[in-house]
From Swiss-Prot:
Belongs to the uracil-DNA glycosylase (UDG) superfamily. TDG/mug family. The keyword S-adenosyl-L-methionine does not apply. This is G/U mismatch-specific DNA glycosylase. It comes from the Bacteria. It catalyses: Specifically hydrolyzes mismatched double-stranded DNA and polynucleotides, releasing free uracil. One of its GO terms (molecular function) is pyrimidine-specific mismatch base pair DNA N-glycosylase activity. GO terms for biological process: base-excision repair, AP site formation. Keywords: Cytoplasm, DNA damage, DNA excision, DNA repair, DNA-binding, Hydrolase. Its EC number is 3.2.2.28. Excises ethenocytosine and uracil, which can arise by alkylation or deamination of cytosine, respectively, from the corresponding mispairs with guanine in ds-DNA. It is capable of hydrolyzing the carbon-nitrogen bond between the sugar-phosphate backbone of the DNA and the mispaired base. The complementary strand guanine functions in substrate recognition. Required for DNA damage lesion repair in stationary-phase cells. Binds DNA as a monomer. The gene is mug. It is found in: Cytoplasm.
Length: 168
């Protein structure tokens, strides 16, 4: 089981779709060696060094957290049903209402659209909010994603810089 890493007062909570088998086996988020999450958040400026999956709790030192839409691990996120994503979106709203981070970053357009019953999402900041929490849709850093490392870092850096501008 991959536990959430959440606390009050966070700048951002990154929300993956669901744990892969590597994460489920180790208990650490974004644990597959091909997953670029840790590299991307470092290069985008969220952390001052590249953390390892087993150091995930240290995200809190940087006022960052992680969660997921669906708890069930799969080989590929495409194995998660629309119903699971929709139910996960409802649970996620409750979590975010409790913790009220500055931003929630959903990692994937389809995950956002199905989890929040939205259509035609674009990358970046969304008009939908959860209380005072901004919702952002960022490309998924999975090794299965075709998005280049450069584009991932650019998208995540936009969020980091927006939070800096807000004084967070």
């Amino acid at each position: 089981m991959v536990e959430d890493i959440l606390a009050p007062g966070l700048r951002v909570v990154f929300c993956g779709i669901n744990p892969g088998l590597s994460s489920a086996g180790t208990g650490f988020p974004f644990a597959h060696p091909a997953n670029r999450f840790w590299k991307v958040i470092y290069q985008a400026g969220f952390t001052d060094r590249q953390l390892k999956p087993q150091e995930a709790q240290h995200l809190l030192d940087y006022r960052c957290g992680v969660t997921k839409l669906v708890d069930r691990p799969t080989v590929q996120a495409s194995e998660v049903s629309k119903q699971e994503l929709h139910a996960g979106g409802r649970k996620l709203i409750e979590k975010i209402e409790d913790y009220q981070p500055q931003a929630l970053a959903i990692l994937g357009k389809q995950a956002y659209e199905q989890g929040f019953s939205q259509r035609g999402a674009q990358w970046g900041k969304q008009t939908l909010t959860i209380g005072s929490t901004q919702i952002w849709v960022l490309p998924n850093p999975s090794g299965l994603s075709r998005v280049s490392l450069e584009k991932l870092v650019e998208a995540y850096r936009e969020l980091d810089q927006a939070l800096v501008v807000r004084g967070r």
